[in-house]
Amino acid sequence: MLIERLHEIDVKAGVAVRPDARRIVTDASAEYLRDMSPLFEAVTSSQLEGAPTTWSDAKCMIRTGRKPRDLGERMILNNYKAMQRIVEIKDHPLTVDLIKELHHTLTEDTLDKPDAAGRYRREDEYVRVADDETVFHVPPHASRMAVEMEALCSFANDDGKDGTYMPDIVRAIVLHFWLSYEHPFCDGNGRVARALMYWSLLRSGYSVFEFVSISSILKKAPSKYVRAFTYVETDEGDLTYFLLHQTKAILRALDEFKDYIGRKARKIQDAESLLKGSRFSLRERTILVQALRNPGYPIRISDCETWCAVSYATARSDMIKLQNHGLVEMRKEGNAFVYYPVSNLIDILEECRKK
């Protein structure tokens, strides 16, 4: 079963037949996905840890650049920054310093002990994984953390050239389990473990995972996530349970991503068809097509100058007309004014077509 799932992941992720999995999203808002997908993973990963913040509040915080209003929003902002950092370092070898940096990014201003961000737990700091009734895991003694984390980094960076081949998906999942098991930090270990799995997947060429949220699947059945972990411990370290659980979650995440892209592409195509017979000018249609392809992404007047090959004054006039039609909203960001497509842009265009 595991071998079949690994092959299925390769096919669905595009690695087996398309080395550049970004092609999957070329025609469906790649820029928007590049910004919003890390946020979706940040939200669901944080919600797994108890953050109550909603998707709409988190999206508003990231888009406007406002400061977090509570602990939940701080966790999400930290996760978002960590996901962006993972993309930056995907081609770098994993080091202890990078693990500590990720932990600091993920937990900054969220811990009961502020000084615990970015450092291993000390021998006098008791850590366990439990709910109100049951202790699921008591991590190994803190004295072994330095050695174990060095070993984990060596494992993560192993390219198999010495003959010790391991499927890349398996390696990423083992990294996830290993860090979770060792629990090297006072808190935030689950977030770091999932971050390392993403780093490993991206480093191995599974670039589609820059856009796929695995935590969104784990959040739907957190008890199964915990159960898969505890089964490994109670069965003499047999990782099969966790590998099967995680490969199933990855496949479901890929399926949901594919469905989302399909829905998005069809909706955009339908809306673009509406524009062809609309009362908007050619320049306005050009701008609206870009807005449809990149929902939630800022439109600057300089962008319109480029798309339509017009002067600044003409581009500004076009954007004001679209604003007056209720199709875009103007916001001030720093010293500049930018425009954002309204969230119900497609619905408004459909209504315009009926009139």
Go through the PLM ranges and name each one:
Residues 1-355:
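FIC/Doc superfamily catalytic core
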